Regions:
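Conserved tyrosine-mediated DNA breakage-rejoining catalytic core shared by Y-recombinases
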Residues: 3, 34-98, 102-110
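Short, basic (Lys/Arg/His-rich) helix/loop patches that form interaction surfaces
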Residues: 4-15, 25, 79, 95-105, ...
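Alpha-helix N-cap/helix-start motif at helix boundaries, enriched for small hydrophobics
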Residues: 18, 26, 30-35, 81
């Protein structure tokens, strides 16, 4: 339901790439938001996860982004791309070319981040979570409207539960266990 809603929503389609990458690869939020174009290889279908983007409070400078090592030693890894993930990266690149959006920040020497906002700054996990909240709200409103109009029978009504971007990591783990 979620992925179909994103694919068919003009308003929320720009969220499809990062959500696809997080669901399909099981990346932590900081790993996904810290990905740079040089960390992915569309030819070999591999993602190099070798750092994480962190957001921290600095006493004098306020809140800042930084780069850190992955959470655990096993966090340094090569993640294979599914066809959906490869398509998501291609979609993100095309979206950025079409809109003129590009990374405008350098963080601890790292630049060219893939998932940036309309200002060219790195996505923050709380921004992703706010986007997910709006997606859930509008998707569920659409489903309820279809039910009220008779397009969907009440017994077939499915609504999205509340979840966060970290839940997408758990969704990936569940899918892998079920495979």
């Amino acid at each position: 339901l979620l992925m179909n809603f994103l694919k068919n929503s003009e308003k929320y389609n720009h969220w499809l790439p990062i959500i696809t990458v997080m669901v399909e690869c099981g990346l932590r939020a900081g790993e996904a938001t810290g990905l740079r174009w040089e960390d992915i290889n569309l030819d070999t279908g591999e993602i190099s996860v070798n750092h994480t983007l962190i957001y921290y409070s600095h006493r004098e400078k306020g809140c800042l982004y930084g780069i850190n090592t992955p959470k655990t030693e096993a966090g340094n890894r090569i993640v294979p791309m599914t066809p959906e993930v490869k398509a998501a990266f291609v979609q993100e690149r095309e979206y950025q070319k079409k809109t003129g959006i590009s990374c405008k920040v350098t963080i601890d020497g790292y630049t060219d981040f893939i998932f940036v906002n309309r200002f060219g700054e790195c996505q923050h996990h709380s921004t992703i979570n706010k986007g997910i909240d709006r997606i859930i709200r509008d998707c569920n409103e659409e489903q309820l409207a279809k039910c009220e109009s008779g397009t969907i029978k009440p017994k077939n009504l499915v609504l999205l539960p509340k979840f966060s971007c970290h839940s997408l990591r758990h969704t990936c783990a569940t899918r892998l266990c079920e495979a």
